[in-house]
């Protein structure tokens, strides 16, 4: 839909931690639709690198663009005062906390994925609004280290507590469940 780039940071300008950079000057524009009080909203773009539409799919094309021609990326993000873009998550994956707070599971997953022995993770919300982290351990690394299942469980619980210390109260992970294999990335036919 948009290629090859929307944003980047030239080497000589320096970067900002967590930022995707600035829109390509003179080529791309980025704005945030319906920002909340933190300035986070849907990232929309327009410019030379944006598609014109989906081939023979007028309904999909209509859904992909705003009425005034901006491409909906499906990302949630914000722009800082210097024009740097920060992606917070995906529109379809945002969760609502118990008091209506926005929870971006990708941000929590990024913290979990930096824990020792974690290959990948997925944060889900239960019916009671509690957050659960499904974690696929790096079993090759676990085996190489000689950890027992009990030691791995204990390590994951300690890591859950560490991650929670970095999160707001409404983002706390209640439980960690170990997953036996990598998560499916594409649907099977």
Regions inferred by a protein language model and the residue ranges of each:
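AMP-binding/adenylate-forming catalytic core of the ANL superfamily
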Residues: 47, 52-53, 76-167
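Conserved A3 ("GATE") glycine/threonine-rich loop of ANL adenylate-forming enzymes
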Residues: 1-11, 24-28, 128-130
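Conserved C-terminal "lid"/linker of ANL adenylate-forming enzymes
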Residues: 120-122, 160-188
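Conserved ATP-binding/catalytic segment of the ANL
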Residues: 22-27, 36-97
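Active-site loops of AMP-binding adenylate-forming
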Residues: 1-17, 57-60, 139
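Ser/Thr-glycine-rich phosphate-binding loops at phosphate-binding pockets of nucleotides
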Residues: 1-3, 73, 97-98, 186-188
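Short Gly/Ser/Thr- and Asp/Glu-enriched loop/turn motifs at secondary-structure junctions
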Residues: 1, 90, 126-130, 171-173, ...
């Amino acid at each position: 839909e948009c290629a090859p780039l929307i944003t980047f940071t030239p080497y000589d300008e320096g970067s900002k931690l967590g930022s995707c950079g600035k829109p390509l000057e003179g080529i791309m524009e980025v704005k945030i639709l319906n920002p909340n009080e933190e300035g986070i909203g849907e990232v929309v773009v327009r410019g030379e690198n944006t598609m014109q539409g989906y081939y023979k799919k007028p309904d999909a094309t209509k859904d992909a663009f705003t009425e005034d021609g901006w491409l909906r990326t499906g990302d949630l993000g914000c722009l800082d005062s210097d024009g740097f873009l920060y992606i917070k998550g995906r529109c379809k994956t945002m969760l609502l906390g118990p008091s209506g707070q926005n929870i971006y599971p990708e941000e929590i997953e990024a913290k979990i994925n930096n824990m020792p022995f974690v290959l990948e993770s997925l944060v889900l919300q239960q019916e009671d609004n509690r957050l659960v982290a499904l974690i696929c351990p790096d079993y090759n690394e676990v085996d190489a280290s000689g950890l027992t299942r009990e030691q791995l469980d204990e390590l994951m619980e300690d890591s859950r507590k560490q991650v929670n210390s970095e999160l707001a109260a409404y983002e706390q992970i209640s439980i960690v469940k170990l997953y036996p294999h990598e998560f499916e990335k594409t649907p099977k036919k």
